[in-house]
Each structure stands twice: as structure tokens, then as C-alpha cells.
């Protein structure tokens, strides 16, 4: 138990220590200031901008920024879709893997361009090396960079005033890839290789075991994809077992690096925001609220798993119970990681929009599974994905400012800018897209007989498997309750739709809000006379409960039919 506390403390300290230097670095990159990596990144950026031409030089309005973002995503979608359909005739395919069916290729292409990485296929048998490297790995970089661009555009809109532009998408995209994601990923990949993660394009090995049977050992360019999988909060595994596979996550060191990588950029953006708007206290307040939410989720999930079998009452179980004091739920977990390493990793993964797992979520106790759902259901704002976590949290921040100001009889304002009705419309649009999307698609799937046939469990747990799939898809997480066989035409198409709506619907609202904020006057006098101090402890509490009440209650009835009912059924066995 002491070792678990030490690991947790080390993890939190590491994230806190990374936040300021990485946040400052991101600030310098997007403010065109000198950085230590200019010598490496600038040549790539020059070639990239030369290819784009004039479109990369002019500042863009919110509408132009969003149009460029969508145009890029459409091109990326077509590119990935074609490769997945034709991978059977493309090179670097030693296993002779055939092209995907159109519904599955559609689902996979949407999944990777939206930074979801939902996988209705098994990586080692469903995708060639060529597709892994040129289609999926590339999207791991650029889809993460797209989320980062949106967050930076939003931060600019708060810092700037009385102007119409929020930056240039194409320029921001290049900076996100060449200055931030690519250099850090290279370092992480090298560490992974030294830890035993393979990086090759060899055919799978056929070996004879001591038992006299033949075993197939997969190979591939794993280290390079694994690095950006975590750093870009993508989560799509090279193997079906994801980070439970010893080739993806062979040691405790790689497990720790993956967890830190998942939170690194999202945590740093809180400091970037504070530094950019000239109020670092505001950034640390955001960091603090995120951290408290994370700790609560981790504690509940860990306790649920450490005592996950206490409800069993047979004599044999009672004999063991009397010896160890409690029964931990080790089903679906790697013995080399144990319960705490598993719950810590999966709390990190579901809090961010990563979706990578080092244990089987479907085997978790119902309450632990519910916490994984809640981490996503509140909008992935517990640090969250690269960029997406920050702009999701900012929507709740705006709502808390609006509610708090009205409660004390003041006109709502944030950092000297008046918050008006139009701003709140975009805020609520962003916050309501997810629950509407999830509840509609889950309700439809729950009454379709063909979907029932894809479930390995019935009743409340079967409903939880369906609910989890659409929560994960709409929030661009990508993790799953594996009891749902997702490779059907209906699930491939509807989950793809939920991913598109959850990603681009929210981005549209965020960028439109940014377009509104950037035009406003910034009155420091207004900020000073306002009684609502947005850096105070009381405001932090207001934001905390706004997230829980608005984010959590919208999905609570569905949770009642799924994991809560599932837990009650177990308690009365």
C-alpha cells in the first residue's frame, strides 16, 4: 500500500513539475518567440508553409479558421479511408492482410481523424504496416495537433481584444506538430526501444514452444506509434490488447512514461493560458480543479477494485477473505501491474481522451466502470485530450462565471470581457452536444435486436457495454467495454457518427465562441470592480460543482440503468 502512495505522489509531482516549463514552451512556440528547438523545427515548417502558399500567411477569422480545420480533416479522412480499403495491394504487408470492409474502414478513418482511435478491428490482424505508419500514425500526430490548434485559438481570443482574427490554422498546425508533438515523441520512442518495445517491419515470427506447439509472435513499428499514442492522447493500440500487451508496455517504466505523456500537454496548457492572459493564478486554478476531480475518480475506482469481490459469500471465498482482509478484483489485469497500477493508468486514460488501457475495463466492478464512464461523460475535462481537455473545461468555466455573476447580481464578465447571451448560447451548445448524442444513439441501439446479438452480457451490464461505446465515441476517448463486438455495419456507422458529432460539433461551438470573445473590449476596470474573483477558492468550488452537476447529471439516468443497477444486482447475489 505504501508503494502505491509513493507511485501516486511521484506521478502528481511529475505532472506539476512539467506543467510550468512545458506550458511556457508552448506559449513561446505559438507567440513566435525563440525556442531551443527552432534549429530542428523551422526547416520543416518552411517547407510545409511553402507548399501551402498564401493560405498560411494571413490571419483568419473564426469562420475561416473552422473552414480550414474541416477542410484539412476531410482530406485526412479520404486519405486514411483509401489506404485502409486498399491496404491488401499496398507494400509493407508481410502478413498479406486484406483491405477493410467499407463500414469498418469508414469507422476507423473517422476514429483516427477525430483523435478517438476507437478500434473495431484487432491491430495485429486487421491493419498492415503500411497503413499503420502512413495512415494511422500520421493521424495520431495531426489529429492531436488539430485539438491543440483549437485550444490555442480560444486562448488567443481571450488575450486579444477588439480584433476579428484568432490566428491561422495552417500555421498553428505546423507548429503543433514540428515544435511540440514530433520532437517529444522521438525522445519517448527511443526510450521505449531501450525498454524492449520493437521497432521493425519484419514478418511475424513462427516459433516452436517447449510444449511442442507453434506460436505466432507479432512484430512491427511499435515504438514510434506507441510514443505518439500517449503523448497525443490518441490511445489506439498497435495490438488488440493495447497497453496490456508486453510489446506495447513491457515494463513499469514504460507504463509510467505513458501515464505522464497522456497528461503532459493538457496540464501544460493550463499554464499556457494563464501566462498568455497575464494571470497565471487563473491557470493554476484550472489545474487545481482538474487535479481534485482526478484524485476523486482514482480513489473511487481503486477502492472499488481493491474490494471488488467483497460481496461474494461462499465458504471458500470466506476462508480466503478471512486471511487477506479483502478480495481484490484481478480479473482482466496484468499480474505485473496489479490493481493500483491498472486503476491509475485507466483513470488517467479515461480522464484524458486517450482510451489506451493496460487492463480490461469490461472486467472491472460496476462502480469502477461507472467512474470510467463519468470521467468521459463530464466532457473529458480532467486534464483531457491535447487541446480538447482545455477547451472543454473552458466551457464549464464560462458557465460557472455566468451562474456566479448572476447569483451576486453582477453583469457576467471574465478577465475584463463582458459575457453576453450569444456567448452563453455557444457555451451551452458545446456542453449539450455530447449528452444528446450519447442518449439518442444509446437509446436506439438498446432496442435494436441485431445490437443485442453483439453483446456477451445481458441485462444491466449489457446496457453498460452499449452506453460505454457511445460515451467513448462521442467524447473521442476510444476505450471500450470489450464485451461489445463492435464490428457490425450498424455499430460502425453510428459510432462513427457519434465521433464526428462529438468532435466537430464541439469544435464549431468553441471556435464561434472564440470569434465572439476576440471582438470584445477588455476592461481591466470591469474586472476589478466585479465581486466575482475567478482566481478564488470559492470560484474553484463553483467550477467544481458546475462540472459535476451539469456534466454528471445529464448522463445520470443512463448510469442508473447501467452500472448502478449492475452493482445493486451484485450486492444482492
Curated annotation (Swiss-Prot):
It is found in: Cell inner membrane. Keywords: Cell inner membrane, Cell membrane, Ion transport, Membrane, Potassium, Potassium transport, Transmembrane, Transmembrane helix, Transport. It is a multi-pass membrane protein. It comes from the Bacteria. The chain crosses the membrane at residues 6-26, 66-86, 135-155, 177-197, 257-277, 283-303, 382-402, 428-448, 493-513, 537-557. One of its GO terms (molecular function) is P-type potassium transmembrane transporter activity. The keyword Heme does not apply. One of its GO terms (cellular component) is plasma membrane. InterPro entries: KdpA (IPR004623). The system is composed of three essential subunits: KdpA, KdpB and KdpC. Part of the high-affinity ATP-driven potassium transport (or Kdp) system, which catalyzes the hydrolysis of ATP coupled with the electrogenic transport of potassium into the cytoplasm. This subunit binds the periplasmic potassium ions and delivers the ions to the membrane domain of KdpB through an intramembrane tunnel. Belongs to the KdpA family. This is Potassium-transporting ATPase potassium-binding subunit. It comes from Francisella tularensis subsp. holarctica (strain LVS). The gene is kdpA.
Amino acid at each position: 500500500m505504501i508503494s502505491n502512495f509513493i507511485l501516486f505522489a511521484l506521478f502528481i509531482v511529475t505532472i506539476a513539475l512539467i506543467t510550468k516549463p512545458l506550458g511556457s514552451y508552448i506559449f513561446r512556440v505559438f507567440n513566435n518567440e525563440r525556442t531551443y528547438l527552432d534549429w530542428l523545427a523551422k526547416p520543416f515548417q518552411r517547407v510545409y508553409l511553402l507548399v501551402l502558399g498564401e493560405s498560411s500567411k494571413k490571419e483568419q477569422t473564426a469562420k475561416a479558421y473552422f473552414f480550414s480545420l474541416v477542410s484539412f480533416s476531410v482530406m485526412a479522412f479520404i486519405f486514411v479511408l483509401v489506404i485502409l480499403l486498399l491496404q491488401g495491394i499496398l507494400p509493407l504487408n508481410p502478413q498479406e492482410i486484406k483491405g477493410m470492409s467499407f463500414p469498418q474502414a469508414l469507422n476507423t478513418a473517422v476514429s483516427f481523424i477525430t483523435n478517438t482511435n476507437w478500434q473495431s478491428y484487432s491491430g495485429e490482424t486487421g491493419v498492415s504496416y503500411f497503413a499503420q505508419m502512413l495512415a494511422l500514425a500520421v493521424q495520431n500526430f495531426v489529429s492531436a495537433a488539430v485539438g491543440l490548434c483549437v485550444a490555442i485559438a480560444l486562448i488567443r481570443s481571450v488575450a486579444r481584444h477588439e480584433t476579428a482574427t484568432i490566428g491561422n490554422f495552417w500555421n498553428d498546425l505546423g507548429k503543433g506538430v514540428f515544435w511540440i508533438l514530433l520532437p517529444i515523441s522521438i525522445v519517448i520512442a527511443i526510450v521505449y526501444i531501450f525498454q524492449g518495445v520493437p521497432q521493425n517491419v519484419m514478418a511475424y515470427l513462427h516459433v516452436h514452444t517447449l510444449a511442442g506447439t507453434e506460436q505466432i509472435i507479432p512484430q512491427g513499428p511499435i515504438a514510434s506509434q506507441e510514443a505518439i499514442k500517449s503523448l497525443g492522447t490518441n490511445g489506439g493500440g498497435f495490438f488488440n490488447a493495447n497497453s496490456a500487451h508486453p510489446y506495447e508496455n513491457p515494463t513499469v517504466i514504460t507504463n509510467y512514461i505513458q501515464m505522464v505523456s497522456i497528461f503532459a500537454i493538457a496540464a501544460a496548457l493550463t499554464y499556457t493560458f494563464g501566462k498568455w492572459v497575464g494571470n497565471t493564478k487563473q491557470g493554476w486554478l484550472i489545474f487545481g480543479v482538474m487535479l481534485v476531480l482526478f484524485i476523486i475518480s482514482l480513489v473511487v475506482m481503486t477502492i472499488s477494485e481493491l474490494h471488488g469481490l467483497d460481496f461474494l459469500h461462499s465458504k471458500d471465498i470466506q476462508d480466503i477473505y478471512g486471511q487477506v482482509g479483502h478480495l481484490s478484483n484481478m480479473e482482466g489485469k496484468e499480474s505485473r501491474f496489479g490493481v493500483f497500477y491498472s486503476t491509475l493508468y485507466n483513470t488517467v486514460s479515461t480522464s484524458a481522451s486517450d482510451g489506451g488501457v493496460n487492463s480490461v475495463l469490461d472486467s472491472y466492478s460496476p462502480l469502477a466502470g461507472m467512474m470510467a464512464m463519468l470521467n468521459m461523460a463530464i466532457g473529458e475535462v480532467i486534464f483531457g485530450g491535447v487541446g480538447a481537455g482545455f477547451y472543454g473545461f473552458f466551457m464549464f468555466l464560462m458557465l460557472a462565471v455566468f451562474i456566479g455573476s448572476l447569483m451576486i447580481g453582477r453583469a457576467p464578465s471574465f478577465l475584463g470581457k463582458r459575457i453576453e447571451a450569444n456567448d452563453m448560447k455557444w457555451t451551452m451548445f458545446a456542453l449539450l452536444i455530447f449528452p444528446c448524442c450519447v442518449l439518442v444513439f444509446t437509446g436506439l441501439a438498446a432496442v435494436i435486436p441485431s445490437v443485442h446479438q453483439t453483446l456477451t452480457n445481458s441485462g444491466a451490464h449489457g446496457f453498460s457495454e452499449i452506453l460505454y461505446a457511445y460515451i467513448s465515441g462521442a467524447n473521442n476517448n476510444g476505450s471500450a467495454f470489450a464485451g461489445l463486438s463492435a464490428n457490425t455495419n450498424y455499430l460502425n456507422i453510428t459510432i462513427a457518427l457519434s465521433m464526428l458529432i462529438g468532435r466537430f460539433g464541439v469544435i464549431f461551438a468553441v471556435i464561434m465562441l472564440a470569434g465572439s470573445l476576440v471582438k470584445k473590449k477588455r476592461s481591466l476596470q470591469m474586472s476589478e470592480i466585479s465581486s466575482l474573483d475567478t482566481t478564488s477558492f470559492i470560484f474553484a468550488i463553483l467550477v467544481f460543482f458546475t462540472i459535476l452537476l451539469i456534466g454528471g447529471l445529464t448522463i445520470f439516468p443512463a448510469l442508473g440503468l447501467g452500472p448502478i443497477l449492475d452493482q445493486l444486482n451484485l450486492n444482492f447475489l
